[in-house]
Amino acid sequence: NTIEREYLVSNPDKIFVIRLKSKKPGALGFTVRFESLLLHTTTASNNFLQANGVAPVKAEPNYVEKKRNAIIFDKKRGTRFTANIQIKTNSGKITNTDSSLSLANATEATIYISMATSFNGYDKDPAKQGLNQTTIAQTQLTKALNLGWDEIKKRHVKDYQTYFNRVALKLEGDPSPNLPTNERLKRYAKGESDPYLETLYFQFGRYLLIS
């Protein structure tokens, strides 16, 4: 069986979305859980998983004082965060434990992940003057669920292309469009000219910078 996967992080809608599709009907299944090295708790019920946590109030190299913990957490201080996860599917069965969501016997599914923190600027205490990260994350998730995968992807691509399409580069020479990149790299390492590979690297660098 083949599973088709698409991932995107939308800047306009502040949402991380994963689209999964099984070539074989009813053969898609997975479990979603939240893991982090930060201090946090996780709950799950009714196809909704939420993690709430806090960043450390202090982190320093462990060689400063070997007897002291280099990373210090305090639930009443530091930047809070919330992560929400929900699965959307037209088939299969969704179940949950107290800290995970599972999908079985599905053909297609979309996983929506929204995250927010209480950070409210460099000059404000994120614990006492912070934003309501729980409300923000829930608002983002609700909006994304209403938009759906197709619309989110459309808005995401349009937003990205606003920057990417500003520049075009075309170098003279044989582009050899059917030659795979790994073969191009081998030839280039031997000193062969490949203007298409140079163009590809230029655009790849822009892709990473914009992202």
Annotated model-derived regions:
Residues N1-S211:
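Aromatic-residue-lined binding/catalytic grooves and analogous aromatic/hydrophobic interfacial grooves
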